[in-house]
Amino acid sequence: MYAIVETAGRQYRVEEGKILYTEKQKDYSPGDEIVFDRVVFVRKDGEVLVGKPYVEGAKVVGKVLEHAKARKVKTVKYRPRKNSKVEKGHRQWYTAIKIEKIEL
């Protein structure tokens, strides 16, 4: 059984027992329960439910594990004939959520 949920302007495929990494959910602390009610798609035992735009009565329940930063992404801008370059780095915040159950 899996579902596709919408959160923070993006859609994610989730399954029970798996960990979902999303944009930082600043309203929740580690250990809090989070409920996704914007379920776009559910597949259970070969049965497919597609929402218009969301599946009625479906929700996904998870538990916030942590807030952390992802690995650093480095960018380099090289200026030819100037013998110089600019290096920049960025680390994006994310929230790790363990999916506990998918309810219909």
Curated annotation (Swiss-Prot):
GO BP of this protein: translation
Entries under SUPFAM superfamilies matching the protein: L21p-like (SSF141091)
Alphabetical list of InterPro entries matching this protein: bL21-like (IPR028909), bL21-like_sf (IPR036164), Ribosomal_bL21 (IPR001787), Ribosomal_bL21_CS (IPR018258)
Alphabetized UniProt keyword annotations: Ribonucleoprotein, Ribosomal protein, RNA-binding, rRNA-binding
PROSITE patterns in the cross-refs: RIBOSOMAL_L21
GO cellular component terms, A-Z: cytoplasm; ribonucleoprotein complex; ribosome
GO molecular function, one term: structural constituent of ribosome
Similarity-based family: Belongs to the bacterial ribosomal protein bL21 family.
HAMAP family: Ribosomal_bL21
Record PANTHER family: 50S RIBOSOMAL PROTEIN L21, LARGE RIBOSOMAL SUBUNIT PROTEIN BL21M
Oligomeric form and interacting partners: Part of the 50S ribosomal subunit. Contacts protein L20.
Function: This protein binds to 23S rRNA in the presence of protein L20.
Protein name: Large ribosomal subunit protein bL21
Organism: Thermotoga petrophila (strain ATCC BAA-488 / DSM 13995 / JCM 10881 / RKU-1)
Gene responsible for this protein: rplU
